[in-house]
Amino acid sequence: MKFLIIDGYPEKSRLQFDTVGMTLAGKLYEKMLFQHIPDAETTILYASDNSTLLPNLEVLKTFDGILWPGCNLTVYHDDDERVQRMIEIVDLAFEAGIPQFGSCWAAQIAVYVAGGKVALNPKGREMGVARKIYLTDTGKSHPMYEGKPPVFDGFISHDDEITVMPEGATILASNDFTSIQAVDVAYKNGSFWATQYHPEYDLKEMARLIVARADKLTSEGYFNSQDDMMNYINILETIANEPNRKDLRWMAGIDDDLLKDNIRQLEFVNWLKFEMLNDK
């Protein structure tokens, strides 16, 4: 099966991720895909780069599915050519009926292209771990959440949120910080399943992302100092390397829904099962 992975992070952001030792967003999705379909064929498209040629409709149709990692652009910045390039891809994929899946920015761009709205979350940034995500009544019976606990935590990093859902879209999950944590968007000839949180992240990658966002997080009051931040990072990375550290897991509030791939990645696995392998 052939998958197109759209990494929308600008080159400057990708270089920063390299500097802090974080895996690039497109590569993270590729890694997650290979865990479940080892022989998958992948193409990673760096869509924000001016040198990258966008696929037309006929090229898109050569792919079985399209994957959307997170991105640090803003979907409602209509004057940003990089955003418009990716809006065009989403719309073409809907038109072609190619199944799409993604996280964070993916949920926002799926809703936005279908006619919904996205805005800055008045509560500010939801960072690190999204606590007590719960399935809506629709989510409890949706195939994306087959086998998922009704309440769980997820890795997260965003300050925008979906505010208005378009016709043909459903809310699958929510929490107290962000009312729309997962969506199923049916539009034109296609569907797009997406989470606001990140099934593809693990504890190490989230720790590295916090390092990449160090200045913002400190200025926004998440840490009193860089030293406080590094103490927290050390706890997270120790848990990643020693997952049986009960003391540190208790201190940081890290449970199996964050540590175990078979729980954390279940939304993606179910998308593969029901949308790609047609187990309907």
Q: Model regions: which residues?
A:
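Cysteine-nucleophile active-site neighborhood
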Residues: 71-139
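N-terminal beta1-alpha1 cap of cysteine-dependent amidohydrolase-like domains
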Residues: 1-96, 220-280
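Short glycine-/acidic-enriched loop or helix-start segments at secondary-structure transitions
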Residues: 15-16, 77-79, 111-113, 166, ...
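Short, glycine/charged-enriched secondary-structure capping and boundary segments
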Residues: 18-21, 80-83, 114-118, 169-170, ...
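A structural signal for short, well-ordered beta-strand segments and their strand-loop junctions
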Residues: 5, 42-44, 101-103, 173, ...
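Pocket-forming structural segment of enzyme catalytic cores
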Residues: 8, 116-209
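Structural motif
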Residues: 58, 93, 102, 163-164, ...
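A glycine-centered loop/beta-turn motif at secondary-structure junctions
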Residues: 180-226, 232-241, 245, 253
